[in-house]
């Protein structure tokens, strides 16, 4: 079964999500948040471009709450306004020398949830969607020559 480019984007998003385990703060937190949100939205763009009837396929899912209230809305806010409704806070355990960092959504449908949990939910949503596409045997557009290498695909990003 063909692997979609969108699956590589999901893999990269999982890698970026795992960086939150390093308890990022300040600049590192903001940069990683931008990366995760941009990648989550890029999955949809890749899928639309990979299929001959991409718009028709994507129309089935674009009204799902995780897409409208999180993937699209959060990406738009951070990329178009360079602001977010996610904050981080250090939480220490009383009687212990340990503390942890929580990344909490401060407004909207996901208010009070940890952004890592919602990113995970979005990743799972995309993976389920791709599984459905594979089961329905949608036809990929001939965008990728099987002889292409990763460096060939990366060339446009070097300029």
Residue spans of the language-model regions?
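Acidic, Ser/Thr/Gly/Pro-rich intrinsically disordered interaction regions
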Residues: 1-34, 52-159
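Extended, well-ordered alpha-helical segments in internal regulatory regions
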Residues: 42-51
């Amino acid at each position: 079964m063909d692997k979609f480019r969108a699956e590589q984007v999901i893999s990269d998003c999982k890698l970026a999500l795992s960086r939150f385990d390093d308890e990022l703060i300040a600049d590192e937190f903001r940069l990683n948040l931008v990366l995760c949100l941009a990648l989550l939205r890029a999955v949809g763009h890749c899928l639309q471009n990979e299929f001959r009837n991409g718009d028709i396929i994507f129309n089935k899912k674009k009204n799902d709450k995780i897409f409208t209230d999180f993937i699209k809305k959060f990406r738009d806010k951070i990329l178009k306004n360079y602001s977010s409704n996610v904050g981080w806070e250090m939480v220490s355990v009383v009687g212990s020398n340990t503390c942890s960092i929580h990344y909490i959504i401060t407004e909207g449908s996901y208010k009070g949830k940890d952004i890592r949990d919602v990113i995970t939910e979005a990743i799972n949503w995309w993976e389920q969607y791709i599984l459905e596409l594979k089961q329905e045997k949608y036809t990929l557009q001939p965008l990728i020559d099987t002889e292409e290498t990763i460096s060939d695909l990366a060339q446009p990003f070097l300029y």
